[in-house]
A protein has these predicted regions:
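Carboxylate-rich, polar loop motifs that coordinate divalent cations or form catalytic acidic clusters
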Residues: 1-228
């Protein structure tokens, strides 16, 4: 009888555990504080906050509530649209944002304001750039690549004042090709820019090849350019 009791107890416990859901799913919507139902990108920052790129602003979630950041008429915000297509975190914890109209902004988490990073240099170039990608490197450098064949190397610590934003392109002969496939920072801090006409390296290393490598892999301090 004791054996039967133990068996039934184990069976009940197993059934109870099996009946528990594997995970809890909670749904969030505009009714929960999300500024828009279309979310195109999600990231978690170093402090654990979740950030959402939506079609109506940038949203920050602390686990309980949403805080929305966007432009309003007459508020002086530099945003040309509240639609975002991509976000990523800088080394210092600010948020890089690519907007729906292909502009690049840095959201300063201290001032809670958007900075149109390329605006100062575009004034000197007398042209507006169409942003393709944003690459953040571990050492605090960000690359913004554009469809026109331009790439901008940005120092995250000084770019908010419009400083240390350097133009790279095949036109001024410091970039091999017009189309950039990938940008990689190796373990020595050298920066590899993979273009359609070869590799440009910012650092001590050199490579003599015009082959259009698409990406770089590193293993045991050895660099392997990859094509596919």
């Amino acid at each position: 009888m004791k054996t039967l009791y133990v068996f039934l107890l184990c069976l009940y416990t197993s059934l109870t555990v099996a009946a528990q859901p594997l995970c809890q799913i909670k749904h969030f919507s505009v009714n929960s504080g999300l500024s828009q139902g279309v979310v195109v990108n999600i990231m978690q920052d170093k402090k654990g906050f979740l950030w959402f790129a939506t079609w109506n602003g940038l949203n920050k979630f602390d686990g309980y509530t949403f805080k929305n950041y966007k432009a309003f008429p007459g508020d002086g915000c530099t945003l040309t649209t509240n639609r975002f297509s991509y976000i990523t975190e800088s080394k210092d914890g600010d948020i890089w944002c690519k907007s729906y109209d292909n502009r690049a902004y840095l959201f300063d988490i201290q001032t809670e304001k958007f900075i149109d990073i390329l605006l100062p240099i575009e004034s000197s170039l007398q042209q507006t750039n169409t942003v393709s990608n944003i690459y953040t490197l571990n050492k605090g450098i960000t690359w913004i690549t554009c469809e026109q064949g331009y790439a901008f190397r940005i120092n995250e610590q000084t770019c908010k004042e419009g400083k240390d934003i350097i133009l790279y392109s095949s036109f001024n002969q410091n970039l091999k090709g017009n189309k950039i496939f990938d940008i990689y920072e190796d373990s020595d801090g050298d920066e590899w820019i993979m273009t359609d006409k070869g590799v440009t390296i910012i650092g001590k290393k050199r490579i003599n090849s015009d082959y259009p490598f698409k990406m770089v892999k590193e293993y045991n301090k050895r660099i392997y350019p990859v094509s596919y």
